[in-house]
Structures are given as C-alpha cells and as structure tokens.
Amino acid sequence: MDPVIIGVGGPVGAGKTQLVERLTRAMSHEISMAAITNDIYTIEDAKILARTSVLPEERIIGLETGGCPHTAIREDTSMNEAAIEQLKKRFPDLQVIFVESGGDNLSATFSPELVDFSIYVIDVAQGEKIPRKAGQGMIKSDLFVINKTDLAPHVGADLGVMEEDSRVFRKDKPFAFTNLKTDEGLERVQEWIRTDVLMLDLA
C-alpha cells in the first residue's frame, strides 16, 4: 500500500519544519514516516530536521528547487515525485511522507497530483488579520494551523478574532492553534492525521 503524502506549506518562519519535527517525534513509534524538504538554494531545512528530528537521516531528503518555491509543489513537481519514489523504495513500510514546501506567499497551494492532503501553517506574529485575507493556501488546505500562539500578547493579536475569521472562511474544514515550542495544540494535529488522513479509527 502506498504511503499517504501530506504537503506542509506556509510563509517563511511560520513553523513548517518545526511542525514536521514535532509530529515525527510524537508519532514515529506508531507510524512509519519520512520527510522531503524544499528550499530554493540550500537544503538547510533538511539539515535542521536531521539534527532535531527522531527520523534517521536516510528518511529525510532535502531538495534545492531554485527559482520560485511554489513551482516545485505545483507546476513542475518532478523533483518531489522522484524523491517520493526514492523513499518508497528505501522503506516499503512507509505510511506517511511529509513534503514541506519552501516558504511562500498566502496563495501557494500543492498540486493534487503530488499530495493527498495538505496542511497550511501561519504564525500569530503575522497579525490577527491574516486569516481574513483568505489566501488560497489557507482556504484549500485540508488542515489550517495557526502557530506561535504564545506571541499573541506581544504582537497585539486577538486569538478569538483569528478563530472567528478562520471559521468563516474554512467553513467545515478543520483548523488548529499551536505553540510548537511547548507542543500545545499538537495533539489536535496528530488526531487529524490518525482519523482524517489514515482513518485509523476505522481500522
């Protein structure tokens, strides 16, 4: 059975790499996982993941995409597709592969031919009005994550406003608030992977 591919997108610094790191740390004992990171000119995110994650280095592939970061996850996904095939051959038991995009704008989305599900991450420090902008990445993602909730009092962001706006534009689609420094809210993301993605509750 092929692994489920989960795209993780969002602006630079929102916490994409940290989310993948925390999820793999929390769930690697129950789910076989691997990760692919996309950077424009470096493989820095892959190095960070290899250094901080519980995943062995051979389960992490870093790609230098060059140019616009969204191209490698939408218009020309061949590099990511090749990396996915490489990981599948290395680890036939894989259940989940994360594909982290390079930091991009609010309109970036994953090609449905590349990923099965997508997570879009923003951080509170970008301002409470960000969800109201309703970028395509936030609207179309299967899970929307608002990270760095601990910064709300320092930047004058009202989490209640962000929640209300998220409910309006997400409608019935799920979203979660997280503080990945302390793992606050991470269980909500884990539960989404277990039930909505892998449907383990039906197994």
Swiss-Prot record:
Keyword Cell inner membrane attached: no
GO CC entries: cytoplasm
Residues reported to bind GTP: G10, P11, V12, G13, A14, G15, K16, T17
Gene expressing this chain: ureG
Disulfide bridge positions per record: none
Family note: Belongs to the SIMIBI class G3E GTPase family. UreG subfamily.
GO molecular function, one term: nickel cation binding
Origin species: Kocuria rhizophila (strain ATCC 9341 / DSM 348 / NBRC 103217 / DC2201)
Subcellular localization, as worded in the UniProt entry: Cytoplasm
Keywords: Chaperone, Cytoplasm, GTP-binding, Nickel insertion, Nucleotide-binding
Chief localization: cytoplasm
NCBIfam families referenced in this protein's UniProt entry, alphabetically: ureG
Chain segments annotated as coiled-coil in the UniProt record: none
Pfam families per the UniProt record, alphabetical: cobW (PF02492)
Oligomeric form and interacting partners: Homodimer. UreD, UreF and UreG form a complex that acts as a GTP-hydrolysis-dependent molecular chaperone, activating the urease apoprotein by helping to assemble the nickel containing metallocenter of UreC. The UreE protein probably delivers the nickel.
Domain of life: Bacteria
Protein name in the entry: Urease accessory protein UreG
Function: Facilitates the functional incorporation of the urease nickel metallocenter. This process requires GTP hydrolysis, probably effectuated by UreG.
Entry's Gene Ontology BP terms: urea catabolic process
InterPro entries: CobW/HypB/UreG_nucleotide-bd, P-loop_NTPase, UreG
